[in-house]
Each structure stands twice: as structure tokens, then as C-alpha cells.
């Protein structure tokens, strides 16, 4: 018998680290002029139309088995991984689908790109939900559609955040895939075999958002753009780092050191972003990960306090110094002198 997961308690447990649903200023996006690099969009659109993964997400016989042999804690952590991944993919589907609908008259090229990206995200979410079904559970995507809460971002911020989200998704998937190709004994479930082609969807989506950013030079070329790029790089990296610090046991179960994994993903994503953003973070500065480690410890302590049976007022007093320390460490990271990536935009990596 399959149990449907509706996440009715989500509003009570939602944090800054929870996958979110976004909306934006559709009129501003509709008025964008993409003539600066229109040929790039035609090339990307042809890539999307080719639909290289149309036959990739097909479940084979290897899925038709019992997963009761998985250790209980590992199974629980893996299901949570599937749920979070499915929610994130579904969030992307809803945003891209709405953008394609709103832009189809004013900017048909961009609208079709969003439509085809929504196809990919829906495919990913459906594949993940089928995997959840192997554990007699199902994420209620219809319920999510009806009850989702939107976070508003202006188009510029949507571009920064989603570009980084797609690129970091690429590096997360390909890093896990390569690890499991080398150590197949850690492949606890066949979905990991799909990550090589899967991550190429993420990479193409990231390239699309890179083209959008380049089509609007003012999103990249002034001092405010540099400040915002630093902010979004730090936000995306810190969110992943703090999330994964809570899930060390899951990464251990698939043979990965979560800290080393995150460091690799952050370095690679930072390198990718340096080809688009005017600045990159100095992730090789020893203080960078030192401060991130402190943030992760602060966040873990905050979670531990929430698990205690103390009175709300007592918890508030216990949390206050931890929040202050976490915020201070994030500010310290932000203030580390960034790398001027504009100076190396023509460097071949």
C-alpha cells in the first residue's frame, strides 16, 4: 500500500534552507531586449528542441526489486534526498511553465526555451517521484501546486539564483555519478546511474540563464552587479553546505565525505560562474571554508535546540548568540576579497 506525502506540516518546519517556489515580475521580463546575443538563444533553443534525454528516463528491470535490505536510517535519509530533489525540480517546472505562458506573445524565443526547460524539470520530478514510489510513498505534487507559497524575486535575481542553481545541480550530479562509477558498491539505488545524462539538462539550463544575463549587460557590468553576484554565490554555496552538514550520514552511506564533496562542488561551480559573473568568490582562501564550517556548526546547534522540550522563550534566548555568530561568519565570508573574473573571461579552462 502506498502512502501519499502531502507535507501538511511544511509551513511549520519551513526554513531558509527549504526548497522554495518563486515568482517574478513578468512584465519586466516580457520587455527585455535579447538582440545583444540573439544567435546564442537560437542555438540554445535548437539544443532544447533536440531533447537528447527523451528516451533516457526509462525505468528498467533493475528497479523491480525490494529495497527492504537498505538499513532503516539510510533508507530514511535517501527518501528525504528524493523528496527534496523532487520538490526542487517541481518548483523549477512551475516557474518555467508560468514564464513560458506569460512570455509567449512578447518574446516567443525565450518562451519556448522556458517551455522546453519545464518539460525537462517535469520529467525529472516525475522520475524522482516514481523512485519515491518504490518505498511505498508518493509526494503529492498536486497538493504542492495548490498550497505552495511564493517568494518574489525580480528577474535579475531570478537569473542569478537560477543560473547558480542549475550549475551547482550539474556539478552535484556529475560528481556523484563519477564517484559511483569508480566505486559501484556504493550505488545503493539505480537512480544514480542516470545522473550523467541528467546533469546535462542542468548544464544546458544553466547556459540558457547565462545567455539571459549576457543579453542584459547592466546585470553584470556595474558595481551593484558585482555586489549581488557575490551575495548570490555565497547564498547558494552556504545553503548547500549547511544542508549537507545535516546529512553527513547519507553521504557516508554512498561512500562520500560530505565536506570534501561540497568543497569540490563549490570550487567547480565557482569556476563555472567566473565565466559569466564579473566576480567569483575566493574559495581557496583558507578562511572561506573555516567560516562556512562555523556556520554549519551554528546551524546544527540551532536545530538541536529546536528538538529540545524547552519553552519557546528559553529557546529564543538560547538561539540568539548562535544566530549572531552565524550571521557574523557569513558577513566575514562576504567581505573576503573576491576574484575579478572579468580579467580572465578570455581564459580557456
UniProtKB/Swiss-Prot annotation:
It catalyses: Mg-protoporphyrin IX 13-monomethyl ester + 3 NADPH + 3 O2 + 2 H(+) = 3,8-divinyl protochlorophyllide a + 3 NADP(+) + 5 H2O. Its EC number is 1.14.13.81. SUPFAM superfamilies: Ferritin-like (SSF47240). Keywords: Chlorophyll biosynthesis, Chloroplast, Iron, Metal-binding, NADP, Oxidoreductase, Photosynthesis, Plastid. One of its GO terms (molecular function) is magnesium-protoporphyrin IX monomethyl ester (oxidative) cyclase activity. GO terms for biological process: light-independent chlorophyll biosynthetic process; photosynthesis. Its cofactor is Fe cation. The keyword Cell cycle does not apply. It is found in: Plastid, Chloroplast. The keyword rRNA-binding does not apply. GO terms for cellular component: chloroplast. It comes from the Eukaryota. Pathway: Porphyrin-containing compound metabolism; chlorophyll biosynthesis (light-independent). Belongs to the AcsF family. Catalyzes the formation of the isocyclic ring in chlorophyll biosynthesis. Mediates the cyclase reaction, which results in the formation of divinylprotochlorophyllide (Pchlide) characteristic of all chlorophylls from magnesium-protoporphyrin IX 13-monomethyl ester (MgPMME). This is Magnesium-protoporphyrin IX monomethyl ester [oxidative] cyclase.
Amino acid at each position: 500500500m502506498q502512502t501519499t506525502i502531502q507535507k501538511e506540516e511544511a509551513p511549520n518546519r519551513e526554513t531558509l534552507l527549504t526548497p522554495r517556489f518563486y515568482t517574478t515580475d513578468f512584465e519586466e521580463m516580457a520587455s527585455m531586449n535579447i538582440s545583444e546575443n540573439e544567435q546564442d538563444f537560437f542555438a540554445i533553443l535548437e539544443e532544447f528542441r533536440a531533447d537528447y534525454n527523451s528516451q533516457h528516463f526509462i525505468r528498467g528491470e533493475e528497479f523491480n526489486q525490494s529495497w527492504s535490505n537498505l538499513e532503516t536510517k539510510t533508507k530514511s535519509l535517501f527518501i528525504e534526498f528524493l523528496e527534496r530533489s523532487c520538490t526542487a525540480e517541481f518548483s523549477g517546472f512551475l516557474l518555467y511553465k508560468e514564464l513560458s505562458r506569460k512570455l509567449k506573445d512578447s518574446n516567443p524565443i525565450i518562451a519556448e526555451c522556458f517551455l522546453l526547460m519545464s518539460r525537462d524539470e517535469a520529467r525529472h520530478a516525475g522520475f524522482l517521484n516514481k523512485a519515491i514510489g518504490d518505498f511505498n510513498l508518493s509526494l503529492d505534487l498536486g497538493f504542492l501546486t495548490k498550497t505552495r507559497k511564493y517568494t518574489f524575486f525580480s528577474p535579475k535575481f531570478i537569473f542569478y539564483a537560477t543560473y547558480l542553481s542549475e550549475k551547482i545541480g550539474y556539478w552535484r550530479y556529475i560528481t556523484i555519478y563519477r564517484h559511483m562509477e569508480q566505486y559501484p558498491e556504493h550505488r545503493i539505488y539505480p537512480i544514480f546511474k542516470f545522473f550523467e545524462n541528467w546533469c546535462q539538462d542542468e548544464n544546458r539550463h544553466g547556459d540558457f540563464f547565462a545567455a539571459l544575463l549576457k543579453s542584459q549587460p547592466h546585470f553584470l557590468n556595474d558595481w551593484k552587479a558585482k555586489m549581488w553576484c557575490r551575495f548570490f554565490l555565497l547564498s547558494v554555496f552556504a545553503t548547500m553546505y549547511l544542508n549537507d552538514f545535516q546529512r553527513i550520514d547519507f553521504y557516508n552511506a554512498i561512500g562520500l565525505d560530505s565536506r570534501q564533496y561540497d568543497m569540490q562542488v563549490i570550487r567547480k561551480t565557482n569556476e563555472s560562474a567566473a565565466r559569466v559573473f564579473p566576480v567569483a568568490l575566493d574559495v581557496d582562501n583558507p578562511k572561506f571554508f573555516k567560516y562556512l564550517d562555523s556556520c554549519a556548526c551554528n546551524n546544527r546547534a540551532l536545530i538541536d535546540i529546536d528538538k529540545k522540550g524547552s519553552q519557546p522563550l528559553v529557546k529564543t534566548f538560547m538561539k540568539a548568540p548562535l544566530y549572531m555568530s552565524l550571521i557574523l561568519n557569513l558577513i566575514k565570508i562576504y567581505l573576503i576579497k573576491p576574484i575579478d573574473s572579468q580579467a580572465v573571461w578570455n581564459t580557456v579552462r
